[in-house]
A protein has these predicted regions:
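Acidic (Asp/Glu)-rich catalytic clusters
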Residues: 279-282, 309-315, 401, 422-424
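Bacterial Sec-dependent signal peptides at the C-terminal "C-region" and cleavage site
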Residues: 19-34
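Bacterial N-terminal signal peptides
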Residues: 10-22
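His/Asp/Glu-enriched, well-ordered alpha-helical/loop segment
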Residues: 366-376, 383-406, 410, 416, ...
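A generic structural signal for residues embedded in beta-strands
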Residues: 66-67, 145, 541-544, 573
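Bacterial N-terminal signal peptides that target proteins for export
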Residues: 1-13
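Divalent metal-binding segments
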Residues: 30-40, 45, 49-305, 322, ...
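Ligand-binding beta-strand-loop-alpha-helix segment within the catalytic cores
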Residues: 428
Length: 576
C-alpha cells in the first residue's frame, strides 16, 4: 500500500475562517434576493453523464433549482435573483471522499505529526525533542509522534539507541507510522504494555507476526495491526474539547480541498461523539456517512450492537450510520506483510492472515444486507479481495440484489479472474489511486517479496473499469493527502520517482472526476441528494481556478479550489 504522506501543509486549518452566507465581494455580481442566486459564465461539470456540461446554475436556499445556460436557468428564479459571474472558471459538484478517516486526520492536524517534516534520523530526533518540550506530542504519560515514513522500521536498532536511553529512558515513546497500521514503541512503552520475550513465546506463530524481534529474540519495538492495537490501548481517551478541535480542523482541511461530504469508515465511539459535538454546535453541515467496525466473530451480536449505535445517534443532523466496516487483512510492505495473498511471501512462506473466517463473514454479509446495512471491507491483498467478494456473493445469492452499494477498499492486488466480479456483484471499488506510483512503497519494500503473478496486478484500476466495475474516489486521509487533484493526476499518469507503475492501468481523467462526485455519492447511498449538479440536489459546489478537464496533467495536478459551498453556504474561500 503506497503511503504518501500528507501534502497539504499541516495546521493550515487555523488560517481558514468559516465564511458568511453568500458570495461576498464576488466579481460580476448583481444584487438581488439573498435566497436565490444564479452562477453563470462558468465551465460546469455536473457529474451527470446524461447531461455532463453546462454554463449556469440557479440556487434557491440550499438547493439547486436549474442547470443549463443563463437564459434557461433564469426562468427558474425571480427576476431579482442575485447573479454571480464566474469568468469562465470551473464549477464542479462538491468532491466526495468515499474512504476518509477525517476525525483522525483532524486529530493529526492538532498533534505532533511528522508527515512531510521528517525524512532522516537526525530530523526525527529534533522533531521528537521539540514535541516533548512543547507538549504537542504528549498524550497522558506517552509521547506520541504521528506520520512516520515506513522506511524507519528498517532501522529499529538505531531508533532504540535514540529513544530508549537518556531523557527517554523512563519516557514511553510511540512512533506511529503514516500507514495507520504500524508503529514503534521504545523500551519504556514496551514494558508498560507487557510486550516481552516471555509474552511473545505464549503467542501463536500468526500472533507473533504482529511484533518485531531482534537478533537476541527480544522485542525490537516494531508493531503492526494487532500489536499496534495493544499499544494504542494505553493512550488516554480524548477530551470533548480535543474531539471538537479535531472535528473543526478536519472540516476546514476538507473544505479547503473542495471536499463537501465523506464516508468515515472506522467510526468508534470517540469518532461518533466528535461528529455529535460538531452537530450540537451547528457546525456539521456536510453529510457524513459513518461505519462502525465489526469483526465477523459473532455476526448476530455484532449487528445488534450496530443497530443500538444507530439508534443512539439517529437524531444527529447530517450523520448517517448506514453500514459496517471490516478488515479482511492488513498491509503488504516489508516488514509488516500482513496483507492476505493467494501466493505466499517469498521471504516467509506465509500468505498473510485473512482476518475473518469465510463462513462467519458470509453469514455476516447475508444478515447485514438483509438489515439494509452497507458492507465496506478493507481488502488489500488479492486473497483478501477474493474472500471479501465471495462473502458479498453469498449475500446477493441469499437476498437477491438489494441495491446496497457494498464496497471494497484499497485493493492493491487483485487476481484477474476477480475483475468481472465487481460488476457482477454490484460491488464498488473505493480505490486510493494516489498510491499508484512507482516508488519505494510499491517497488523496493514490496516487489522482492511477492510472487510475480501477484505483483503484476498492482492497483489494477483500468482492469476493474474495463470489466464494468465502478470506482469511487477515496483518500484514506490521514494516511495520505485528501487532495483530489493529486489523486486524479496519479490515476491518469501513474508516474513516480522511479518511473511509471504499469501505464496500462491508467484511468481517464474525467472518469476520476466522476469517481469523486457521482460514484462516491453512490458508495454512500446518497446519490439522491448529493454528487451531481442537478435540480433538487443540495447546493454543494466548488469553484476551481482552471479548466481541469482540458489542461495538461501537471497543470491539473496544481489546481486550487477557490470557493467551497455546502448546502448553499460558503464555508471556504481563498483570499484571491
Amino acid at each position: 500500500m503506497n503511503r504518501f504522506s500528507l501534502v497539504f501543509v499541516r495546521f493550515v486549518y487555523a488560517l481558514f475562517v468559516l465564511m458568511p452566507f453568500g458570495f461576498q465581494d464576488s466579481p460580476a455580481r448583481a444584487q438581488g434576493s439573498g435566497s436565490e442566486r444564479i452562477l453563470f459564465d462558468a465551465k460546469i461539470f455536473t457529474g451527470d453523464p446524461q447531461n455532463p456540461y453546462a454554463s449556469a446554475v440557479a440556487i434557491r436556499d440550499d438547493k439547486i433549482v436549474a442547470v443549463g445556460n443563463l437564459p434557461e436557468v433564469a426562468k427558474s428564479v425571480s427576476p431579482n435573483a442575485e447573479r454571480v459571474g464566474l469568468h469562465g472558471k470551473s464549477l464542479f459538484p462538491g468532491f466526495i471522499d468515499s474512504h476518509s478517516h477525517s476525525l483522525m486526520g483532524g486529530m493529526a492536524l492538532i498533534s505532533a505529526d511528522a508527515s512531510e517534516k521528517v525524512k532522516t534520523m537526525d530530523e526525527l530526533v529534533t522533531f521528537v525533542a521539540e514535541a516533548k518540550t512543547s507538549g504537542r506530542g504528549i498524550r497522558g504519560e506517552i509521547l506520541q509522534i504521528l506520520g512516520l515514513p515506513l522506511e524507519f522500521w528498517s532501522h529499529t536498532d538505531e531508533l532504540d539507541t535514540k529513544f530508549s536511553i537518556g531523557v527517554y529512558a523512563n519516557q514511553p515513546v510511540l512512533l506511529s507510522g503514516m500507514d495507520g497500521h504500524t508503529g514503534w514503541a521504545n523500551r519504556a512503552l514496551l514494558k508498560r504494555a507487557g510486550i516481552t520475550s516471555e509474552y511473545l513465546k505464549k503467542l501463536s506463530e500468526g500472533e507473533r507476526s504482529y511484533y518485531g524481534v531482534g537478533k537476541d529474540s527480544e522485542p525490537n519495538g516494531f508493531v503492526v495491526d494487532a500489536g499496534m492495537e495493544k499499544i494504542d490501548r494505553l493512550l488516554p481517551k480524548a477530551t470533548d474539547d480535543r474531539l471538537l478541535a479535531s472535528g473543526r480542523a478536519a472540516l476546514q482541511y476538507n473544505y479547503s480541498l473542495g471536499i463537501t461530504s465523506w464516508l468515515d469508515p472506522l467510526a468508534n465511539e470517540d469518532i461518533l461523539k466528535a461528529y455529535k459535538l460538531l452537530a450540537d454546535h451547528d457546525e456539521l453541515i456536510s453529510k457524513v456517512v459513518a461505519f462502525p467496525q465489526v469483526f465477523a466473530k459473532d455476526p448476530g451480536a455484532e449487528l445488534a450492537g450496530v443497530q443500538r449505535t444507530r439508534e443512539a445517534y439517529k437524531n444527529v443532523h447530517n450523520l448517517y450510520i448506514t453500514g459496517i466496516k471490516l478488515f479482511a487483512d492488513g498491509v503488504v510492505e516489508y516488514p509488516s506483510q500482513t496483507a492476505n495473498l493467494t501466493k505466499p511471501y517469498k521471504n516467509t512462506g506465509r500468505n498473510g492472515d485473512l482476518l475473518f473466517d469465510p463462513k462467519k463473514f458470509a453469514e455476516l454479509c447475508v444478515a447485514a444486507d438483509k438489515q439494509g446495512l452497507i458492507i465496506h471491507v478493507h481488502a488489500l491483498g488479492d486473497g483478501a479481495v477474493k474472500a471479501a467478494l465471495s462473502g458479498i456473493a453469498a449475500a446477493r445469492k441469499a437476498n437477491g440484489n438489494s441495491g446496497l452499494p457494498h464496497t471494497l477498499t484499497h485493493e492493491q492486488f487483485v487476481a484477474p479472474e476477480d475483475f468481472p466480479r465487481f460488476r457482477e456483484l454490484g460491488v464498488i471499488s473505493a480505490l486510493q489511486l494516489l498510491w499508484a506510483s512507482a516508488g519505494m512503497d510499491t517497488i523496493e519494500i514490496v516487489k522482492p517479496y511477492l510472487d510475480a503473478g501477484v505483483y503484476k496486478w498492482q492497483y489494477p484500476a483500468r482492469s476493474i473499469l474495463d470489466n464494468g466495475g465502478v470506482i469511487s474516489g477515496a483518500s484514506d486521509w490521514p494516511v495520505s493527502s485528501a487532495n483530489v487533484f493529486l489523486a486524479v493526476y496519479q490515476a491518469e499518469t501513474r508516474k513516480g520517482p522511479e518511473g511509471v507503475l504499469d501505464a496500462s492501468q491508467d484511468v481517464p481523467r474525467e472518469a476520476m472526476f466522476y469517481a469523486y462526485t457521482r460514484n462516491s455519492a453512490r458508495a454512500m447511498d446518497l446519490l439522491d441528494s448529493i454528487g451531481t449538479i442537478a435540480p433538487g440536489k443540495r447546493a454543494d459546489l466548488i469553484l476551481i481556478d482552471r479548466d481541469v478537464l482540458t489542461v495538461s496533467p501537471e497543470e491539473m495536478r496544481d489546481a486550487k479550489v477557490l470557493w467551497t459551498i455546502v448546502a448553499g453556504k460558503t464555508v471556504y474561500r481563498t483570499s484571491n
